[in-house]
Structures are given as structure tokens and as C-alpha cells.
From Swiss-Prot:
It catalyses: L-homoserine + ATP = O-phospho-L-homoserine + ADP + H(+). The keyword Transferase applies. It comes from the Bacteria. One of its GO terms (molecular function) is ATP binding. One of its GO terms (biological process) is threonine biosynthetic process. The lineage of its organism: Bacteria, Pseudomonadati, Pseudomonadota, Alphaproteobacteria, Acetobacterales. It comes from Acidiphilium cryptum (strain JF-5). Belongs to the pseudomonas-type ThrB family. PANTHER family: AMINOGLYCOSIDE PHOSPHOTRANSFERASE DOMAIN-CONTAINING PROTEIN (PTHR21064:SF6), AMINOGLYCOSIDE PHOSPHOTRANSFERASE DOMAIN-CONTAINING PROTEIN-RELATED (PTHR21064). Its EC number is 2.7.1.39. This is Homoserine kinase. Pfam families: APH.
Length: 319
């Protein structure tokens, strides 16, 4: 989450007149994340999250995202529920942007994920995959493999200023990853960005899965690969196979992986590392200096990619 667009008290008060959630008591910007402008909103009726959509989000995709969230919430998944205005709309204009209000979920995200977090995460992700099976609309993954070469091209040679030779290393890894990319694996709706700051815990149980604005219809095992990257590396970039094993066991207790999915884990993990390296690099270059936003170091994913390039099989991930 982040803040790019400022909202005045008067504009927000007028916006809330269209909703049955009471009057504004307080609101503040949330600096974490890099995508949309987000505010914590308290009204006389309770706590909510206000999101103004920015940057990579295509307005045409918003009904799909919010529809998926409503669908998953109806299946008892702990995800935000979009709040509809009096006229039934869940998207409305505010401060020159399209905006939505969603319910607030209690809990905190784990700053230092442990093995105890990884098992519940895997199980929750599998339940999410199964719960989305009967959500009929589909959405192509704009940041899937076909999107990585043009993203690298847009970064130009700027990667070499971050680390000498980075652009060439990433290009070589990308070419090899695309050549080995699996196509015929089970697919459905995935979160595609299930990082620790998008997962809330309360009393050692998952209380919230948030930020579905990269969700898409893609390989289930790719969603797992994203999480292996995000949850299973230590601060020194060593891979924690105990965390990985817990995550995979938690997932497979709900939805067992096929042999082909298991075999594909190394290349899927390489692809996930490349995806986040590239988007972080692009944001590193292009984030405005005055934006209330936390930029993330692209090299965090360079070192992850180095591990995946050396992985010989799924056994290196604890399978």
C-alpha cells in the first residue's frame, strides 16, 4: 500500500455522503507498498480502507478484482469485502481517481516470517485457489512471462547503475526461464502478490489476505513460487528449506500438487524472482521523490534469483 494522491477532508466528506457507513472521524495515509493510494479510514460506523487506484491498475480490471474479492469473502476466505454505495456501485470517483472502500481486517503482518507462519500461509493459499474455481470471469496476468521482456526493455541499462552487469545477467536468466516455462499445468485464479505484508495474523491464525490488485488467471504453482520467494529467504538471502517445506506441506494438505507442478517449481521460482526484480527495478527508477511510498530494493530479488539458478530440482525446495 502507498499514497500518491492526496485527499482533502472536504472531498472525502462529500465522497462518503454516497455511502451508508457514517461520517468521517479520522483518516491517514498508509505508506507501505508501491501500487495504489491507500488510507486507513475511521467513521462513526467503524474502520475501513479507502483505495484510490493508480499506475499499473487498468480501470477496466477493477470490476474483476472486486468481484473476486466478493466471491472469496462469500466462501469464508478472510479477504476484504468491497463496500457498495447507496446506488449499488463499489467504484466511485474521488480526487481525480477511481476509488473503492473495503472492510477493515484485524491483525498484523509478520515482519519476520517464521516456520509457524508458513504452514498456515500454504493452507490459506490452497483454500483461496479452490474457492476461486467457480468464479467464472478470467483475467490474463499482465505481469506474467509475456510481460517480462518489455518490462526489461523499459528499464534500459539502468540496472547496471544498481549493480554492474545486472541488465545482462537478468536478460540471460530471462531467456533461459522463458525457454523452459511450463504451459500445461493446473491453472485458475491466483493472488500473484501474497507477500508477508499482504497476510494478516491474529492469535497465530491468518485473519486476512489483502491487496488483490495483481490477481489473475494463471498457474496455481506460480502463486506458490511467488510465496517461496517472499517467505522463505532469510535476511542474508539464504534459502530456508524448513520454511519452504512447511509452506508446501500446508498447501498440499488442502490441494495436492501434481507431479508436473512439483517438477516445475525451480523454473517457476526463477520466473517469480525475475518478475519482482524487474518491477522493483522499474519502480526504483520511476518513483517520484515526493511520493509517500516505500521503495523496495531490486537486488533483494537478484540474490533470490541466484539461488534459483543453482537449484537442481524440486528437492532443493523441500519436496
Amino acid at each position: 500500500m502507498a499514497v500518491y494522491t492526496e485527499v482533502t477532508d472536504d472531498a472525502l466528506a462529500a465522497f462518503l455522503e454516497g455511502y451508508d457507513i457514517g461520517r468521517m472521524v479520522a483518516f491517514r495515509g498508509i505508506a507501505e507498498g508501491v501500487e495504489n493510494s491507500n488510507y486507513s479510514l475511521r467513521t462513526t460506523e467503524g474502520d475501513f480502507i479507502l483505495t484510490l487506484y493508480e499506475r499499473r491498475v487498468d480501470p477496466a480490471d477493477l470490476p474483476w478484482f472486486l468481484g473476486l474479492m466478493e466471491h472469496l469473502a462469500a466462501k469464508s476466505l478472510p479477504c476484504p469485502l468491497p463496500v457498495r454505495a447507496r446506488d449499488g456501485a463499489n467504484l466511485n470517483p474521488l480526487a481525480g481517481r477511481i476509488a473503492a472502500i473495503t472492510t477493515f481486517l484485524p491483525g498484523v503482518w509478520p515482519r519476520r516470517p517464521t516456520v509457524a507462519h508458513c504452514g498456515p500461509l500454504g493452507a490459506a493459499m490452497a483454500r483461496m485457489h479452490l474457492a476461486g474455481e467457480d468464479y467464472a470471469p478470467t483475467r490474463a496476468n499482465a505481469l506474467g512471462p509475456q510481460g517480462w521482456p518489455p518490462l526489461l526493455a523499459r528499464c534500459g541499462d539502468s540496472g547496471d547503475a544498481v549493480r554492474p552487469g545486472l541488465t545482462g545477467e537478468v536478460r540471460t536468466a530471462l531467456d533461459a526461464t522463458l525457454a523452459a516455462w511450463p504451459g500445461a499445468l493446473p491453472r485458475g485464479h491466483i493472488h500473484a502478490d501474497l507477500f508477508p505484508d499482504n497476510v494478516f495474523f491474529l492469535d497465530h491464525a491468518i485473519s486476512g489476505l489483502i491487496d488483490f490488485y495483481f490477481a489473475a488467471t494463471d498457474l496455481y504453482a506460480y502463486d506458490i513460487a511467488v510465496c517461496l520467494n517472499a517467505w522463505c529467504f532469510e535476511p542474508d538471502f539464504s534459502f530456508n528449506i524448513t520454511k519452504s517445506r512447511a509452506l508446501l506441506r500446508g498447501y498440499q494438505a488442502v490441494r495436492p500438487l501434481s507431479a508436473a507442478e512439483t517438477e516445475a517449481l525451480p523454473v517457476l521460482c526463477r520466473g517469480a524472482a525475475i518478475r519482482f526484480l524487474l518491477t522493483r527495478l522499474y519502480d526504483w527508477i520511476n518513483t517520484p521523490d515526493d511520493a509517500l511510498v516505500t521503495r523496495k530494493d531490486p537486488l533483494d530479488y537478484y540474490w533470490r534469483l541466484r539461488f534459483h539458478l543453482q537449484a537442481g530440482s524440486a528437492a532443493d525446495y523441500g519436496v
